Amino acid sequence: IDYRKCQASQILKEHGMDKVIPLPELVCTMFHISGLSPQAEV
């Protein structure tokens, strides 16, 4: 599990740069914000 990628995506989204984040990154961010483990998707 790479939480750093999730956190990086969240930071980018907060700065309005979420449009440049690939879909998998955005999904990872949404899981992170929701408090769910990214593993749940697998």
From Swiss-Prot:
InterPro entries: Glyco_hydro_22, Lysozyme-like_dom_sf. Mammary gland specific. Secreted in milk. Coiled coil: none annotated. Residues 1-42 form the C-type lysozyme domain. One of its GO terms (cellular component) is extracellular region. PROSITE patterns: GLYCOSYL_HYDROL_F22_2 (PS51348). It is found in: Secreted. Keywords: Calcium, Lactose biosynthesis, Milk protein, Secreted. One of its GO terms (biological process) is lactose biosynthetic process. It comes from the Eukaryota. Its main location: secreted. Regulatory subunit of lactose synthase, changes the substrate specificity of galactosyltransferase in the mammary gland making glucose a good acceptor substrate for this enzyme. This enables LS to synthesize lactose, the major carbohydrate component of milk. In other tissues, galactosyltransferase transfers galactose onto the N-acetylglucosamine of the oligosaccharide chains in glycoproteins. Belongs to the glycosyl hydrolase 22 family. Lactose synthase (LS) is a heterodimer of a catalytic component, beta1,4-galactosyltransferase (beta4Gal-T1) and a regulatory component, alpha-lactalbumin (LA). This is Alpha-lactalbumin I. It comes from Macropus giganteus (Eastern gray kangaroo).
